[in-house]
Structures are given as C-alpha cells and as structure tokens.
Amino acid sequence: GELLDDLVAFTTKKNLSGIEALSAIPGTVGAAPVQNVGAYGQEIEQVLESVHAYDLKEEKYVTIKKEDMNLGYRQSIFNHGKDAGRYLIISIRIHLSHDRLTPPFYTSLQSYVEEHQITDFSPKSIREMVTEIRWSKLPKPEEMASSGSFFKNVYLDDQEAERLRSMNVPVWEGNKVPSGWLIDHAGLKGKSFYGMRVSEKAALILINESAQSYAHLKQAREEIVSIIEKKYGLTLKQEPVELE
C-alpha cells in the first residue's frame, strides 16, 4: 500500500494543508483511519471523507462514510467493537485545503518555532519541522524496532483535571494529560522491565532489549501501569492493538 509519509510529502509539495503534521508517521495510508492517526494537533478524521474497503464478512466492496466510522482518539470501527478486523481498506478519500496552520501550535512544535524563530508556516515548512522533531525523539523503524507510542494519552473529566493540575501535572486542551510526561516524571525513562526498556528519548516508546515472549511485554506493561497508578492515580491504556 501507499505509505502515509509519501502521501504527506506529495500533498505538501502541492502546498495543500490538512495532514502536514502527520509527517514521518510509519505505516500505510489505508491504516491511517484504523487508529485515526494524529500528531501535533492534526488527526486524519479532520480531512477524511470516506474509505473504500473490502468487507471480509459479506465478501464485497463497500464505501464507508466518515460519520459511520465511530472515529475517536486512536480508535474506529476498524479496530474496536464487533466489526474490528472486518474491513480491508483499499483507498481513502480526503479533503485538503490551501489554508495554513497558524500559531499557537502543539506544545513541542510551538517550542521549535520559537527557538528557531520560524515565520514560514507553509505545509512544506510544517512538514520539515515535524519531521525533525519526531526523529529527534523517536527511534527510526529501520534502526530500532518498536511499535511506536505504546500508551495513549489520558483524557480526564474536569474534576480529575483539577486534581492533576494541583499536582503540577500539565493538562492540555480538552483535559488531556501527556502519558509520556507521566512516565518521564515517574523516573522511568531508560529503565528496563522484564527485558523491555523505556526509551531515553521518548518515554512512550518501549524497546525490546531481551524480552523473549509476549508474557515479558505484558509484565513490563503492567509494572509501568502500576507505577503510574500509584504515583498519579491514573490508569494508562495500551495503544497498539493485540492480535489473537
């Protein structure tokens, strides 16, 4: 299938906006709606109109509109619920524009803009910044295997958000708490659990150093989740979908 990053590169060269912040995300275009991929303030659902897919249950091709995909934070009908795994996505239809992203940006992108005094916010410029930021923090798949971000960010109700703010935990727009921050400030960066190491660059990344089975990964996950629960009273959720 077509790589998502190749599509982003193509669209930014055409000066089209809508997915430039999704630069350098590994994976294919067809997989993007499955997790409703997103980064630096953009999500595929913001531009997605429909997908053309093969229904493995009914054995026929279908078109599924965005409003029927139950898109949410890293989820859709394609990976959650009774229809998970039912559809093989063949192509997607998206609507891009010539509008540009404008400041203030997502935290790390805004910091980069200010540090480097960037004034060009064209899709091509945003792509270049996001790519540099991403590879400064994340291991490149061809150099070190990982599943990417292993834990989802945490969404809170207003009461919980206030509790976390009182603990000096950053709470972003929409009452979102960055799980990477929680793991980092729990002192887990660089630590190993059952052969799985928390990346020194990005706390959301788990790297297999010596784990020999899924059981080791499960133990590592449970240990990290337990530490965060005890320190912050929050339960981290795994982002990668497990195949049975």
What do these predicted ranges mean?
Residues 1-57:
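Anion-binding (especially nucleotide phosphate/pyrophosphate-binding) glycine-rich loop
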Residues 61-216, 231-244:
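Phosphate/pyrophosphate- and phosphate-bearing ligand-binding catalytic cores of soluble enzymes
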Residues 224:
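Phosphate/pyrophosphate-binding loops and the adjoining catalytic core of nucleotide-dependent enzymes
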